[in-house]
């Protein structure tokens, strides 16, 4: 993606610090690491941002301490309703990546948040086309 015309964003909170973003992203999967790298590249280009990274069990890594830290937003992979609830408890704007499909209805707790959903069918077709063309 070309970012022609965009300017470096120097956002500051009321306390004067840059955006403090909670990242709830598992890193064992190469795809998730690529997504994380994309987020970090964007932050480097348009930041500065401060990050708090959670890669495993939420409670063990301090998701409850986001208010103490001054978290201003979150980007999260969530696989269960409990994970969604834990992230929403931070009470900050959230971008959910591939949330559970069962939580995507109009009355869902996710209905007021940005959700990025992979199109697995399109990915599969693209992979099949690639190999069929060889």
Q: Where does each model-flagged region fall?
A:
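Bacterial carbohydrate/catabolite-sensing allosteric modules
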Residues: 1-75, 83-134
């Amino acid at each position: 993606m070309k970012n022609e015309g965009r300017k470096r964003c120097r956002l500051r909170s009321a306390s004067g610090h840059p955006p403090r973003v909670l990242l709830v992203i598992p890193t064992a999967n190469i795809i998730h690491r690529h997504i994380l790298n994309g987020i970090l590249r964007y932050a480097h280009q348009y930041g500065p941002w401060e990050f708090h990274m959670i890669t495993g069990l939420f409670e063990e890594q301090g998701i409850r301490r986001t208010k103490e830290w001054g978290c201003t937003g979150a980007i999260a992979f969530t696989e269960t309703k409990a994970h969604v609830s834990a992230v929403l408890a931070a009470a900050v704007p959230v971008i959910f990546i591939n949330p559970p499909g069962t939580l995507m209805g109009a009355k869902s707790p996710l209905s007021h948040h940005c959700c990025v959903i992979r199109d697995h069918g399109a990915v599969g077709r693209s992979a099949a086309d690639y190999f069929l063309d060889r």
